[in-house]
């Protein structure tokens, strides 16, 4: 990893993209974080990397939720409510990310000036 990070940005990105397809879940997630950092000015590329991982179907349920939350933060400004609800799991009772999911949707509703929905979520957040 350190060898890759010391190289030219384009070469670095190509080599990281190869590693992204690793069969090792941990390696893929660590590489994703590096790719997101390298491409922090390109939301589309970052979303594409997350989609690649989501489409491989090689991750645990917990990591799939984690990837979807990452994606929801990247698409936050342009997403529709349906897109956000498809990414954020508000129904799961045992989610490790339940409170965070509620808070992201709360912020989404506030940003879209949907105050009634935001207030409903705020009540649920405060109850938990």
Specify the residue positions occupied by each region the protein language model found.
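Extracytoplasmic/periplasmic/luminal assembly and interaction segments
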Residues: 4-59
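Soluble extracytoplasmic domains of inner/organellar membrane proteins
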Residues: 49-128
């Amino acid at each position: 990893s350190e060898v890759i990070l010391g190289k030219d940005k384009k070469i670095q990105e190509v080599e990281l993209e190869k590693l992204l397809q690793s069969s090792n879940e941990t390696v893929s997630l660590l590489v994703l974080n590096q790719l997101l950092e390298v491409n922090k000015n390109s939301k589309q590329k970052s979303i594409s990397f997350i989609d690649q991982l989501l489409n491989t179907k090689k991750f645990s349920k917990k990591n799939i939720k984690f990837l979807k939350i990452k994606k929801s933060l990247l698409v936050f400004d342009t997403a529709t409510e349906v897109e956000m609800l498809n990414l954020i799991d508000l129904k799961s009772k045992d989610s490790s990310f339940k409170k965070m999911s509620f808070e992201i949707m709360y912020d989404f509703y506030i940003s879209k000036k949907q105050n009634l929905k935001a207030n409903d979520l705020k009540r649920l957040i405060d109850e938990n």
